[in-house]
Swiss-Prot record:
Residues 163-279 form the HD domain. SUPFAM superfamilies: HD-domain/PDEase-like, Nucleic acid-binding proteins. The keyword NADP does not apply. This is 3'-5' exoribonuclease YhaM. One of its GO terms (biological process) is rRNA 3'-end processing. The keyword Nuclease applies. Its EC number is 3.1.-.-. It is an enzyme of class 3 (hydrolase). Shows a 3'-5' exoribonuclease activity.
Length: 314
């Protein structure tokens, strides 16, 4: 079986089909144009540079294009890159299905739906339960397919749902340890906090930001969605405002994207749960590509640190 891109080590030669996830134009110090492309397969992605590109080449190598690439793997300033020696667009008779090249959540969609539904079923506050069920049903198809982000954490097909399922299990464990927490509020906050990303982001493959995403962002989008759902369900109660606050504050600080800091206990805990799950996902994926006794490539979203994998960890 042919190796996947994440399985190659520094110095190894590569000759493989990959999908262009993103392609970004830049200008080199010599004034010539180049492309920074992120190439992916189900195991993950890797950055590559295409130097001295013509306008015709730019039009060829765009997002969602399958390419055949030959080159080698190198470590450039702590980042793993693919140095391209040859590249061409794949022929239709070679590969055609883009879905064969995308990373997916390690849990089946139907299993995630079942688990999330069970958490909603356990809610005892009827207003919170109705609002949560209504909004999840409204956006369920996209919720199950979309990534949680364009980069950094859970940036794969079904990553949003996988992030939520992991956070729900964390929320349950923390609620059992601290019974003063309102489980209904916390579970609803987990399910709804990033649901606006199904409007903020373009889709599960070659994900970019929509116009609404660029101008409003998923936090504002979801606060509005909760308000609309409350009107449709004729719920006029404080739970609506508290849920809106939990979503609004889940990034923790204004400089991190939240207009208000958490001012409700469950909002504070949601912020920590969200942060913990995102960071664990980033570390696990980086360490999963690393041999025992070696350091990961630098993880930009974690202060550009490289993490060491102990020799006794297989």
């Amino acid at each position: 079986m042919k190796k996947k891109i994440a399985e190659y080590e520094v110095g190894e030669q590569v000759d493989i089909f990959l999908l262009i996830k993103t392609a970004t134009k830049g200008i080199a110090s010599n004034g010539k144009p180049f492309l920074t492309v992120i190439l992916q397969d189900p195991s993950g992605d890797i950055e590559a540079k295409l130097w001295d590109v013509s306008p015709e080449v730019e039009k060829q190598y765009v997002a969602e294009t399958i390419v055949k690439v030959a080159g080698d793997i190198l470590n450039y300033k702590g980042r793993i890159q693919l140095r391209v020696k040859q590249i061409r667009v794949a022929n239709e008779n070679e590969v055609t299905d883009i879905s064969d090249f995308v990373e997916k959540a390690p849990v089946k969609k139907e299993d995630m739906v079942e688990k999330i539904t069970q958490y909603i079923f356990e809610m005892r506050n009827p207003n919170i339960q109705r609002l949560t069920r209504h909004l999840l049903n409204k956006h369920q198809n996209e919720f199950l397919d979309y990534p949680a982000a364009t980069k950094n954490h859970h940036e794969f097909v079904s990553g949003l749902a996988y992030h939520v399922v992991s956070m729900l299990d964390l929320a349950k464990a923390i609620s059992n340890l601290y019974p003063s927490l309102d489980k209904d509020l916390l579970y609803a906050g987990v399910i709804l906090h990033d649901l606006g990303k199904v409007i903020e982001l373009s889709g599960p493959i070659s994900t970019t930001y929509t116009l609404e995403g660029n101008l409003l962002g998923h936090i504002s989008i979801m606060v509005n969605e909760i308000g609309k759902a409350a009107d449709e369900l004729q719920i006029d109660a404080e739970e609506v405002l508290i849920l809106q606050h939990i979503v609004l504050s889940h990034h923790g600080k204004a400089e991190w994207g939240s207009p208000k800091p958490p001012l409700v206990k469950e909002a504070e805990i949601l912020h920590y749960i969200d942060n913990l799950d995102a960071k664990m996902n980033m570390m696990d994926r980086a360490l999963g590509r690393t041999k025992p006794g070696e350091y990961t490539e630098r993880v930009f979203a974690l202060d550009n640190r490289s993490f060491y994998k102990p020799t006794f960890h297989n």
